[in-house]
């Protein structure tokens, strides 16, 4: 999207900063993200992954191509309730994740105050914490693995999660 209305919606977050992005991409698939990475690499345009926009420090605004994965890449891919593990897409909102985990007697313990809007991708990018962090830890203590696309378009795996065949698909 190149229109000023759409770009304006992504020019701010919960911080005091305002910066108009060059464009906004709302990917439907991971191939869309890879194509966006290639375009940015070929044109020298910066990219900015954006999730809930709940940061009060301005990490989600910049003069860049903003990629918003919250609209379509927001599901639980796999759930292993017995081992208390799941594979999720980066755009899933924390409250929605916990709503889907609750019938299995599970919940994700990192409890940010913006849980109705904060996404797992954004929480991972910021290593989020919350009021229960002293007991249950912060994001790095509760995430086993992340798969991420690098600027050259390659997929890198961080951590180890052999029992799940799917990547965590977190930028």
What label would you give each PLM region?
Residues 41-43, 50-52, 118, 142:
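Short, basic and Ser/Thr-rich N-terminal targeting/leader segments
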Residues 45-46, 107:
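Residue-level detector of anion-binding/catalytic polar loops
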Residues 75-79, 86-171:
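FAD-binding subdomain of flavoenzyme oxidoreductases
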Residues 1-42, 54-84, 113, 136:
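N-terminal flexible segment immediately upstream of the FAD-binding catalytic core
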């Amino acid at each position: 999207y190149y229109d000023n209305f759409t770009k304006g919606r992504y020019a701010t977050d919960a911080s005091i900063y305002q910066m108009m992005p060059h464009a906004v991409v709302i990917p439907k698939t991971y191939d869309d993200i890879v194509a966006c990475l290639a375009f940015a690499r070929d044109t020298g345009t910066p990219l900015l992954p954006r999730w809930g926009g709940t940061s009060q420090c301005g990490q989600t605004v910049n003069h860049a191509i903003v990629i918003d994965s919250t609209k379509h890449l927001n599901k639980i891919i796999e759930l292993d309730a017995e081992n208390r593990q799941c594979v999720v897409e980066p755009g899933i909102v924390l409250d929605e994740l916990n709503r889907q985990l609750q019938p299995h007697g599970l919940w994700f313990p990192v409890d940010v105050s913006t849980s109705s809007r904060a996404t797992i991708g954004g929480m991972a990018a910021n290593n989020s914490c919350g009021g229960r962090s002293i007991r249950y830890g912060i994001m790095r203590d509760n995430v086993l693995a992340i798969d991420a696309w690098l600027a050259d378009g390659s997929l890198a795996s961080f951590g180890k999660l052999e029992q799940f065949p799917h990547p965590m698909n977190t930028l």
